[in-house]
């Protein structure tokens, strides 16, 4: 199967998981990215069963609304039973690198209030040690040089994210992203705390303190489920 076929497989598995485990009238938490988009598409026929969804990005909001979902403000929602999102990398403890799509801060916020985080990914995303995928760090624009120096002191090689048009990439929150390569992340929780403590950092794309609870992994043999 192609990578796109594996993504579609896990997206449908996530839809099946939600339908089996989330009560009618609940609010869904929805992530960002290509696999999350396929999950949104798979849930579209069942939208009437749910009160609505909380989205982690403007892009996902547009896709949800295009399918007729009510997209709710997180401030108006008391509980989110399940948050479904992809990952750029995930290890065997459920710790993840996320943020390749630029929505790491909102993803982390929605994940933090969800009862359960269901990660959907193809088999290429499962790794022994995090860090081959450059680690995204969202930064207040005025602090980007100062933060970059501190990330370099931690052993990383930070690079300012740019658009295809050669402009500085801007998040939905109006910030910039430093993508940090060269890190071999043996202790994700420790590094997450270290980077979050740097003044000017909004958040880091390490999801270790609040990692995945369930992984639905698309493989040639089908969807594998892992619980953490």
Curated annotation (Swiss-Prot):
Its UniProt entry gives the catalysed reaction(s) as:
aldehydo-D-ribose 5-phosphate = D-ribulose 5-phosphate
Q: Does the keyword Repeat apply?
A: no
Tell me a GO cellular component.
cytosol
Entry superkingdom = Bacteria
Q: Which UniProt keywords apply?
A: Isomerase
Q: What is its EC number?
A: 5.3.1.6
Q: Name one GO biological process term.
A: pentose-phosphate shunt, non-oxidative branch
Enzyme class, UniProt record, top EC level = isomerase
User: GO molecular-function annotation terms?
Assistant: ribose-5-phosphate isomerase activity
* Disulfide partners: none
- Check the record and name the Pfam families matching this protein: Rib_5-P_isom_A
Q: What does this protein do?
A: Catalyzes the reversible conversion of ribose-5-phosphate to ribulose 5-phosphate.
Assembly and partners are described as: Homodimer.
Which family, according to UniProt? Belongs to the ribose 5-phosphate isomerase family.
**Name of this protein:** Ribose-5-phosphate isomerase A
**Species:** Ralstonia nicotianae (strain ATCC BAA-1114 / GMI1000)
């Amino acid at each position: 199967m192609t990578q796109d076929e594996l993504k579609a497989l896990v997206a449908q598995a996530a839809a099946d998981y939600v339908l089996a485990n989330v009560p009618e009238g609940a609010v869904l938490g929805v992530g960002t990215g290509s696999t999350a988009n396929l999950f949104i598409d798979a849930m579209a026929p069942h939208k009437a069963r749910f009160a609505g969804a909380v989205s982690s990005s403007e892009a996902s909001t547009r896709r949800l609304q295009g399918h007729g979902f009510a997209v709710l403000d997180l401030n108006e929602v008391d509980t989110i039973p399940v948050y479904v999102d992809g990952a750029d990398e995930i290890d065997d403890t459920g710790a993840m690198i996320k943020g390749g799509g630029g929505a790491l801060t909102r993803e982390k916020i929605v994940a933090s209030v969800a009862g359960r985080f269901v990660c959907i990914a193809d088999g290429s995303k499962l790794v022994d040690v995090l860090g081959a995928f450059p680690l995204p760090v969202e930064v207040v624009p005025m602090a980007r040089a100062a933060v970059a120096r501190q990330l370099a002191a931690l052993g990383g090689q930070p690079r300012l994210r740019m658009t295809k048009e050669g402009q500085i990439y801007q998040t939905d929150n109006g910030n910039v992203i430093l993508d940090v390569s060269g890190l071999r992340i043996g202790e994700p929780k420790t590094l997450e705390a270290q980077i979050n403590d740097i003044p000017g950092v909004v958040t880091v794309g390490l999801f270790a303190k609040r990692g995945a609870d369930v992984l639905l992994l698309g493989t040639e043999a089908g969807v594998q489920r892992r619980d953490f």
